[in-house]
Amino acid sequence: MKKKILLLIIISLPALGSEIIDKRKQLFQENKDHMRFIYKAMQSGDMDPIINSSMAIEKFASEMPEYFPEGSESRGASDNIWSDFEGFIKSAKANQLAAQKLKLAAQVNEIEKLNGLFNELSNTCKSCHRSYKN
């Protein structure tokens, strides 16, 4: 009986890894969409999409490391994620904080700060991609 349970667990592991990989790909695509929404909203001066999209990016960034458990390696994810997981966590935290700063500026209508904060947020994405994306 124990052998059957162990075999079932071993067989299920790749499927679990595949599910989390698919989910993180979906969330990264949503992040990309949110960046576009923010950019367009900055052109029109509409703060609501900036606030909402910044909140979504902030939320995902706070959870991002959870979507990279050991054994969930994929073609697009660099091995550096797992060999330097603390660095990866710091990069996700930088992204979270940049999204939070953009959200806060939009909430108080600090339009003059938005371009700089959007660039800061964008740079956290680029920095992480350089280090942790294939």
Where are these regions (language model features)?
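The canonical Cys-X-X-Cys-His
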Residues: L121-K133
